């Protein structure tokens, strides 16, 4: 039986093959939700995913999106600062801007098509991890660790970080790692993907006094259907995709 596997592609089956009875891994509609931050965050909110408080700008005011509810009529003065503006289709941190106060945000807003952005409360948690997951669980994980000479230290991406594997002592698995995995799987399910990457941001294992935390607060940042993969990552994906195809036979 023919299988179509999408890692970021939106190409429908009929443009790939005349055969309609095919196995699909990551359907186009799931990728569409995952790649658009507004659609993705709506899916998170509807499914009670542990994620940052977020807002859109509509009809001259900000709207906060909450599970089963909206809070309307919010002006820039009442937003939780610092706040992030995020391009709905930006990747790898592109299109993201940190606004420390109302003045910064108002200056940035001038001349922008604000419907192309979402806005998130900024959580300055010390660590970020990427979990590669299926709806069964995780199969590959990395810690993003900032380079010592990184200038902008409010975000983590491939330019200012190195990637630390789970076997490395610096990985420093959080005490509530199972909760993190559970939320990442739920996030993947909420957007409809079969396989993909989920980024989380989380508190460090110790508090400011050096005491071990009993739990580490965290948020799910986003899902990704086309993550950058090393040779090792590609091998892991190949094995998991084969499993997914066999399961759907």
Named regions from a protein language model:
Residues 8, 88, 122-123, 132, ...:
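Anionic group-transfer/hydrolysis microenvironments
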Residues 189-193, 202-249:
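C-terminal active-site "lid" helix and adjoining low-complexity regulatory extension at the edge
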Residues 1-73:
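Conserved N-proximal alpha/beta basic substrate-recognition cap immediately N-terminal to
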Residues 30, 59-62, 88-92, 103-104, ...:
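Short acidic/polar capping segments at secondary-structure boundaries
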Residues 40-41, 86, 222-224:
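Active-site ExK catalytic segment of metal-dependent nucleases
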Residues 83, 139-140, 196, 217-222:
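Protein kinase-like catalytic core scaffold
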Residues 44, 71-94, 114-126, 142:
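ATP-grasp fold ATP-binding core
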Residues 97-187:
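Phosphate-binding site of ATP-dependent enzymes
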């Amino acid at each position: 039986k023919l299988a179509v596997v999408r890692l970021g592609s939106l190409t429908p089956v009929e443009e790939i093959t005349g055969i309609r009875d095919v196995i699909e891994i990551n359907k186009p509609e799931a990728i569409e939700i995952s790649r658009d931050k507004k659609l993705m965050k709506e899916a998170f909110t509807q499914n009670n995913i542990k994620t940052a408080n977020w807002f859109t700008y509509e009809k001259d005011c900000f709207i906060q999106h909450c599970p089963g509810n909206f809070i309307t009529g919010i002006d820039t003065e009442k937003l939780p600062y610092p706040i992030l503006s995020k391009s709905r289709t930006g990747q790898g941190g592109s299109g993201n801007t940190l606004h420390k106060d109302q003045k910064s945000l108002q200056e940035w807003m001038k001349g922008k098509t604000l419907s192309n952005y979402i806005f998130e409360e900024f959580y300055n948690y010390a660590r970020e991890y990427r979990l590669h997951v299926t709806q069964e669980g995780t199969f590959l994980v990395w810690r993003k660790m900032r380079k010592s000479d990184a200038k902008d230290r409010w975000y983590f991406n491939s330019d200012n970080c190195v990637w630390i594997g789970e076997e490395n002592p610096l990985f420093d698995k959080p005490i509530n790692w199972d909760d993190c995995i559970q939320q990442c799987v739920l996030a993947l399910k909420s957007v409809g993907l079969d396989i993909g990457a989920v980024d989380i941001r989380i508190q460090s294992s110790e508090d400011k006094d050096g005491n071990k935390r009993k739990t580490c607060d965290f948020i799910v940042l986003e899902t990704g259907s086309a993550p950058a993969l090393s040779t090792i990552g590609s091998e892991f994906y190949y094995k998991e995709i084969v499993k997914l195809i066999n399961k759907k036979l």
